[in-house]
């Protein structure tokens, strides 16, 4: 059965808007099922559950999706699992119970949604994955992600132009595909050069309020370090807050990824080494 043009067009617009937000480094993986869109011209409901709403990146993505949805007279239901896989599963089930016509998901866990995505797939509900992938891509209609590996590579290359040696602290979020790839890209780039050493790894869920005390605790260990490589800008903000509180921000190189306005301002002020930019507006427009 062919997709009716009405809702198929909305899905296309969502997907295009999201991908446009990513900028030049995005991939759209289309595994489109021919019977996935309801044959109806009635208003539709789109459900969205992000990894966390405590990140301006996702709030901007949601704003762009909302614009597209409203333009077509449809409804957007946005939920925040607050980094909890259990909550995200409950939210996806809730959205199915609300009979949504499509789902936009930023997964909390790379592998944790397998069984539920299979259920969604069997219900013929299109799924758009945004920003970070899931392992079970066969149940997904569209994946819109930036080149997370290359983002880590770019951070490493910038660091290597500024420092000929460094002791490095990693703030990571290993259970998400995007977080894993960003750190892997960074580490792979420095791997062959013994002048760059990773001396500490800390899981922070990409959250400022987790990264800050983790960084504070590490500072109290008294170890010498030069660079803090962070999987995203919120964790970089947490690291810088801890460094600033200990009068250690000067001379330290803090890297982030996302290109949030706050991070860009920190870079301009010389407080942050760099942030690799993504465009959440593009993500949102393509998902919309």
Residue ranges and their predicted role:
Residues 45-64, 68, 72, 77-89, ...:
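Extracytoplasmic "Venus flytrap"
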Residues 77-99, 201-222, 236-237:
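Structural motif
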Residues 110-150, 161, 260-268, 272-273:
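Flexible loop/hinge segments that line or gate small-molecule binding clefts
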Residues 107-121, 186, 205-265:
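Hydrophobic alpha-helical
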Residues 65, 153-196, 200-201:
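An alpha-beta-alpha
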Residues 10-25:
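Hydrophobic membrane-insertion alpha-helices, especially the h-region
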Residues 248-288:
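Flexible loop/turn connectors
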Residues 144-166, 210-212, 260-263, 279-288:
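Hydrophobic alpha-helical segments within soluble ligand-binding/sensing domains
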């Amino acid at each position: 059965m062919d997709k009716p043009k009405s809702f198929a067009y909305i899905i296309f617009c969502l997907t295009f808007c999201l991908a446009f937000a990513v900028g030049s480094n995005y991939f759209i993986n289309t595994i489109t099922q021919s019977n996935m869109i309801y044959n109806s011209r009635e208003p539709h409901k789109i459900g969205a559950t992000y990894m966390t709403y405590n990140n301006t990146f996702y709030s901007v993505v949601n704003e762009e999706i909302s614009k597209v949805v409203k333009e077509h007279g449809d409804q957007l239901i946005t939920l925040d699992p607050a980094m909890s896989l259990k909550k995200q599963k409950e939210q996806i089930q809730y959205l199915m119970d609300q009979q949504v016509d499509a789902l936009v998901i930023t997964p909390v866990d790379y592998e944790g949604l397998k069984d539920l995505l299979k259920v969604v797939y069997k219900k013929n509900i299109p799924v758009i994955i945004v920003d970070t992938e899931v392992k079970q891509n066969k149940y997904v209609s569209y994946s819109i992600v930036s080149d997370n590996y290359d983002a880590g590579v770019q951070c490493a290359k910038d660091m290597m132009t500024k420092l000929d040696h460094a002791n490095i602290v990693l703030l990571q979020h290993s259970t998400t595909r995007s977080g894993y790839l960003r750190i892997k890209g960074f580490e792979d780039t420095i791997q062959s050069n013994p002048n760059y050493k990773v001396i500490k790894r800390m899981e922070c869920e990409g959250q400022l309020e987790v990264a800050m005390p983790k960084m504070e605790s590490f500072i109290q260990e008294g170890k010498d370090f030069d660079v803090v490589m962070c999987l995203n800008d919120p964790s970089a903000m947490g690291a810088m807050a801890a460094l600033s509180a200990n009068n250690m921000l000067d001379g330290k190189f803090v890297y982030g990824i996302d290109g949030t306005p706050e991070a860009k301002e920190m870079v301009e002020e010389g407080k942050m080494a760099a942030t690799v930019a993504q465009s959440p507006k593009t993500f949102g427009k393509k998902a919309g």
